[in-house]
From Swiss-Prot:
<dbReference type="InterPro" id="IPR053781">
    <property type="entry name" value="F-box_AtFBL13-like"/>
</dbReference>
<feature type="repeat" description="LRR 4">
    <location>
        <begin position="248"/>
        <end position="273"/>
    </location>
</feature>
<keyword id="KW-0677">Repeat</keyword>
<feature type="repeat" description="LRR 5">
    <location>
        <begin position="339"/>
        <end position="365"/>
    </location>
</feature>
<protein>
    <recommendedName>
        <fullName>Putative F-box/FBD/LRR-repeat protein At1g22000</fullName>
    </recommendedName>
</protein>
<feature type="repeat" description="LRR 2">
    <location>
        <begin position="182"/>
        <end position="207"/>
    </location>
</feature>
<dbReference type="InterPro" id="IPR050232">
    <property type="entry name" value="FBL13/AtMIF1-like"/>
</dbReference>
<dbReference type="InterPro" id="IPR006566">
    <property type="entry name" value="FBD"/>
</dbReference>
<dbReference type="Pfam" id="PF24758">
    <property type="entry name" value="LRR_At5g56370"/>
</dbReference>
<dbReference type="Pfam" id="PF00646">
    <property type="entry name" value="F-box"/>
</dbReference>
<dbReference type="InterPro" id="IPR036047">
    <property type="entry name" value="F-box-like_dom_sf"/>
</dbReference>
<dbReference type="InterPro" id="IPR001810">
    <property type="entry name" value="F-box_dom"/>
</dbReference>
<feature type="domain" description="FBD">
    <location>
        <begin position="373"/>
        <end position="424"/>
    </location>
</feature>
<feature type="repeat" description="LRR 1">
    <location>
        <begin position="154"/>
        <end position="181"/>
    </location>
</feature>
<feature type="domain" description="F-box">
    <location>
        <begin position="28"/>
        <end position="74"/>
    </location>
</feature>
<dbReference type="Pfam" id="PF08387">
    <property type="entry name" value="FBD"/>
</dbReference>
<dbReference type="InterPro" id="IPR055411">
    <property type="entry name" value="LRR_FXL15/At3g58940/PEG3-like"/>
</dbReference>
Amino acid sequence: MSFLWDIMPIDKHLSTVPETEGCQQRIETRICALPDDLLLQILPHVPTKEAVATSILSKQWRYVWLMLPKLEFKDEGSESVGWFIKKSLQLHKAPKLDCLIVELGPHCPIDVDVRKWVENAVNRDVKDLDFTLLWSAAPTSFPKSLYTCDTLVCLTLSNQILVDVSSPASLPSLLDLSLHYVVYKDDGSLVRLLSSSPVLKRLSVHSHEDDNLKTFTVKVSSLESLNYDENWLKDEVEDNEVDEVVDNEVEVDDLNGSLVIDSPALKELHLSEVWDYCLIENMSFLDEAFISNVPYPDEKFLRSLSSVKHLFLLFSKSMVACCNAIKFSWLIEFYFFPISLVDWLMPLMFLLQNSPKLKTPTIDNDFECLSLSWNQPSSIPGCLLSHLETFRWRGYGGREDAKKLLMTYILANSKCLKTVEISLLATCNLEETQKELKSMPRISQSSQLLISTKKLWRINERTYL
């Protein structure tokens, strides 16, 4: 019962004496004297297995756990976990079950009836349902009643789960949906699931190669946040080959599938390891975009990001041709991560020219890259003249002449500059590089120059190493 001792108010004189048998009995007596209402607030914060164990403390405690609004079961390798969950749900007497979390590991027997557990939760107006099936059984479908649960607010389905929405569905309260490494019966099941959620705000997807979908379509008018990760290819490619994979020229017809996003209310978009063709439409309210390893973007894809205020962009060779054509009229914060095979200096200057309100650009090229070319722009980007306040460069080495010229240009023309944060490559001559940076003229005399070897930046309250 130590988990309860940790949160109980203990008298000062008790906290300074050894835990003798008498002292422990006094503490247990105080715990048992707590009112039921307080116990029902405490027990949801401990594992259900521990909460059930409290029933042996006293007659008062025997039935307390039966009224808990939240049950959480995580398989720790026990073959009896299925029996324990089944009996717990049978004995649980609360009229409503707000939250049910179940995680079954690879050693769990495959004959447990998870469908009945889901049915039990749905029948008791569950609000938060989270199932992770890591067992060796084939993907398991859930009862149809799950997809017509009008109280469900958060739904998380992970791993060996078959999303089968064959009949009309209705999830009028669903706000958060997470689909992680699941399998879909067909494209229609996904479409019906999303279209049945009229107030859905947040969608998180981790897809894999064998999910049985040709096209992943996200058409949700209410959606505000989308996190889509397709990392199956990365697992098959060595780290030193990723850059080459990103920049291989591939025809759209050769791709395995496609990602289609049509969500006009979207404010946050995170795309990572998206190896399929990506089509984005109707995103005029997009505020933040995190684009990492999207190898085949076209101009239409990048143009769909033009309304963002915060942009993280892993910059690939296929993006070079689009830089001069797209205006980022509202961009304030820009994290620019060019891969090693790209001559990126001039594309970056185009992006600066097309981002008149940019305040905080960050360059991250923490690697040795190919030879870069530099041509001084014919006109100074507007953001340098009137908006740019903080300039960051992670992985500055100072050895390449082109990089020195870019750094000199930024410092010499950024009139509103307040802070320059430089993280140096460990391979460079630290003393010489610091001296060189300090000697570069700055038009903003009040600006601070901060130089370190630490590799930590914060973007829109997120930390990136």
